């Protein structure tokens, strides 16, 4: 296994190359994100909020983690927006995350809506997605997006402020795990959902990237804005300290790096991804932090070693019990072929992605 001389990415990362000095293509190309600019963000916020059809300027989805809490603070206290918050209850929220959200919405004096699908249906979705594709995060992502679109539409909200940060831009699998056509194919193959359950979960069962883009243009769907891509981000530790002071946010003190502690299944999914792909989000995020100058490579390696990604997480048995999985099931999961369902993604989405890339050239 080849490891970059500057960060901790390995040759398991798809498309990664190394120069003669052993430096990966991300590091050698100075792959550090530059914000689009706060002035541009403010112009977008001011323009889009005039399209509201109700009392709220923006919807802020909350998970209880750092980024979404920080976005909530910025929206209310910095950009003076009238905000509605929502959470998709995926069945795996940590109690710490739930408590963080409750304190934050009280301090910011905002309304909070929790969208909760049927537990038994969710369990069938997660179990069968994991057994067939080795991943459950994509299904959760589909549920989050569908519900945030619905809440925004129900309340006439013109935009959604999403807490995704540049730190995560290279953190996820290239597999299109949130493709609805792919999701439908896997669920039909599993035979675990009725048509009604499928439609209830998806909410917009025929949605694709082209329909979504057109819908946003004509006001059928809200505009998605990622504020952390426009402004200079606080380092991870400083962001935690800031929202602790302003929102009484509590951190997971059991580990040094606490992104995604809001979901108790995250260590499990990282373990599975590493076994199947040879890398996972922590490796990517720590490498991005190295390139941003937040930590040294040595520090990244120490943090990564402390995560014990290659070992079964402490709550491994709990996750198996929740999803009615056996050790034999997990043996099969870890043998899943990477990107097994890529050929079943939406043709419209494929074409749309190519078109967007061509336009950006």
Where are these regions (language model features)?
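Short, glycine-rich nucleotide/cofactor-binding loops
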Residues: 58-67
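Histidine-anchored nucleotide/phosphate-binding helix
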Residues: 68-80
